[in-house]
């Protein structure tokens, strides 16, 4: 193996390490937590989803709204928050 081949593999290795670090950093995005005190309507796929929830929450004076549940066993509801 020549010196050029070693240098090429070294650069590929460095690029791979740098790329994997970026993936880890971007996948660690912080999830915004909100209170479940303002959960109203059940979300049903194809009938009442995130868009409808957002509109309803905006009409109630909230800045945000999305379909969420506290645990996997709980039903998914439209929860509003600021």
From Swiss-Prot:
Which keywords fit this entry according to its UniProt record? Antimicrobial, Disulfide bond, Fungicide, Plant defense, Secreted, Signal
Entry's localization field? Secreted
User: What biological-process GO terms show up in the record?
Assistant: defense response to fungus; killing of cells of another organism
Q: Carries keyword Signal?
A: yes
The record, for Pfam families, names: Defensin
* Cystines in this chain: 39-80, 43-67, 53-78, 57-79
**Which Gene Ontology CC terms are recorded?**
extracellular region
Q: Does the record carry Zinc-finger as a key word?
A: no
- Principal localization reads secreted
Tell me the leader sequence span.
1-28
Q: Which family does it belong to?
A: Belongs to the DEFL family.
Q: What's the protein here called?
A: Putative defensin-like protein 48
- Organism, by scientific name, is Arabidopsis thaliana
The root-end lineage is: Eukaryota, Viridiplantae, Streptophyta, Embryophyta, Tracheophyta
């Amino acid at each position: 193996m020549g010196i050029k081949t070693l240098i090429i593999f070294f650069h590929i290795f460095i690029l791979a390490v740098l790329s994997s670090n970026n993936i880890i950093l971007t996948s660690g995005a912080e999830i915004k937590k909100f209170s479940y005190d303002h959960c109203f309507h059940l979300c049903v796929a194809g009938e009442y989803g995130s868009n409808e929830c957002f509109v309803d929450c905006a009409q109630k004076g909230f800045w945000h709204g999305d379909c969420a549940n506290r645990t996997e066993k709980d039903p998914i509801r439209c929860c509003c928050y600021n």
